[in-house]
Amino acid sequence: MNIKPLNDRVAVKYLEEEEKTRSGIVLPDTAKEEKPQQGEIVAVGKGCTPEDGDPEVKVGDLVVFDKYSGTKVTIDGEDYIILNLEDVLAVIEK
């Protein structure tokens, strides 16, 4: 993948959706039509690094983002979303 977000934007790859819940319930296709709200940051624009040099997000971070934000793009058959940094709501720490 070769994408370079500009300014304060990040490129996020959608996480694969689960086929069934943790309790074993198989999800129908209609339930999977909902837009995912989690993904992995694959590229970060230069405007995402503050002057003190400590970025809030970096490549490889798993993030939660606003449901109706960003621009969806498909590159080499993979779905990504380009988000403004302010639309990233949280970093998922393991």
Curated annotation (Swiss-Prot):
Protein origin, superkingdom: Bacteria
Complex formation: Heptamer of 7 subunits arranged in a ring. Interacts with the chaperonin GroEL.
Give the stretches traversing the membrane. Answer: none
- Keyword Secreted attached: no
Q: What is the lineage of its organism?
A: Bacteria, Bacillati, Bacillota, Clostridia, Halanaerobiales
Q: What does this protein do?
A: Together with the chaperonin GroEL, plays an essential role in assisting protein folding. The GroEL-GroES system forms a nano-cage that allows encapsulation of the non-native substrate proteins and provides a physical environment optimized to promote and accelerate protein folding. GroES binds to the apical surface of the GroEL ring, thereby capping the opening of the GroEL channel.
Q: Name one GO biological process term.
A: chaperone cofactor-dependent protein refolding
Q: What is this protein called?
A: Co-chaperonin GroES
Q: Which SUPFAM superfamilies match?
A: GroES-like (SSF50129)
MF (Gene Ontology)? ATP binding; metal ion binding; protein folding chaperone; protein-folding chaperone binding; unfolded protein binding
Family per similarity comment? Belongs to the GroES chaperonin family.
Gene Ontology CC: one annotated term? cytoplasm
Coiled-coil segments, which residues?
Answer: none
Classification via InterPro entries: Chaperonin_GroES, Chaperonin_GroES_sf, Chaprnonin_Cpn10_CS, GroES-like_sf
Q: Which HAMAP family match?
A: CH10
- The source organism is Halothermothrix orenii (strain H 168 / OCM 544 / DSM 9562)
Protein localization = Cytoplasm
Q: Which UniProt keywords apply?
A: Chaperone, Cytoplasm
